[in-house]
């Protein structure tokens, strides 16, 4: 007999149908395809270029700070909305790395237990039933999900190659603008790897003023850029009047499991975020925040990681070009975003990127992530594991990439 509890689930997560859906989502399909490929080719190495998680641990010096701070009696308790020492360090870091000036460490900065809850909480601060969030696609879905949970709707802004993967703000209709409260941006962008420009950020600021909305710029990959200097939305004139930027320690400092991020920018938005956060959590463990302070004081940790990804991405671009793909170095992140082929010379057909991605896993044992939201593309990550004797090894890195090249060049892909 079915439990009465089945009838109590909120509509936002499916109501009475919660847990009964038979839809198989993208990442579950990838997981199943990987399992099937391993069974079919048990002696063949599966090369995972789909996962978007750093391959290395946090720097040894960061771990040491955590250990030392964890031994201190004073650090045992709640931190609520964060230790002031971390808040004091954040503006110094943002000015040194990104040129952001005049950020108030008391009223314009708050830490978060990772960027995911930050995106969720800020959405709850502003969205009422009927409100609209402007959301770039493809992209990280948290803001869109929570907008819908609060009775709002999402207007998608496609990121197209012809526009350098920047949204066309001028194309948004007057009707949508009138109900919009949030413009969500993410640069450097996951999955496209695109970097925004100062010109675009200024357009976003002007757009926010003209339409009475806020900008949430998700800067999870902000410190991982190639070519140009890292760019912050908050470094643009008047940006602080309309929005906030969310920075994460996960990608820049190999601290995904540590769950530490911060929100910086407009005082009112930060205050609203802090009020909601205060009702959800009691702050990140103080020793983790102290380790975060050490990170911000040592940007050379990030530089070492950034250089590794740049080296790998450069090699991946060369390999993909040799296999027929139109691959280019990204502006930032650790991803390559390449157009999927429509088939192979020997007769295989791919209706979309998902079908190509499944082919790659099942036949070549190379895992990628497909995106069919705005064109047919696959994302390939440079954070694959390449260790030898417990250390990152360029020799092992080259072995893996040479194997990727061998498998890709065995096939003649057909492109539009």
Swiss-Prot record:
Enzyme Commission number, as recorded: 2.6.1.83
Known catalytic reactions: (2S,6S)-2,6-diaminopimelate + 2-oxoglutarate = (S)-2,3,4,5-tetrahydrodipicolinate + L-glutamate + H2O + H(+)
Pfam families: Aminotran_1_2
Coiled-coil ranges per UniProt: none
GO molecular function: L,L-diaminopimelate aminotransferase activity; pyridoxal phosphate binding
Subcellular compartments: Cytoplasm
Keywords tagged on the record: Aminotransferase, Cytoplasm, Pyridoxal phosphate, Transferase
KO phenotype (gene knockout): Cells lacking this gene are unable to grow in the absence of exogenous L-lysine.
Record PTM N6-(pyridoxal phosphate)lysine, positions in chain: 251
Function of the protein: Involved in the synthesis of meso-diaminopimelate (m-DAP or DL-DAP), required for both lysine and peptidoglycan biosynthesis. Catalyzes the direct conversion of tetrahydrodipicolinate to LL-diaminopimelate.
Subunit-structure text: Homodimer.
The protein's name in its UniProt record: LL-diaminopimelate aminotransferase
Organism, as annotated: Methanococcus maripaludis (strain DSM 14266 / JCM 13030 / NBRC 101832 / S2 / LL)
Higher taxonomy: Archaea, Methanobacteriati, Methanobacteriota, Methanomada group, Methanococci
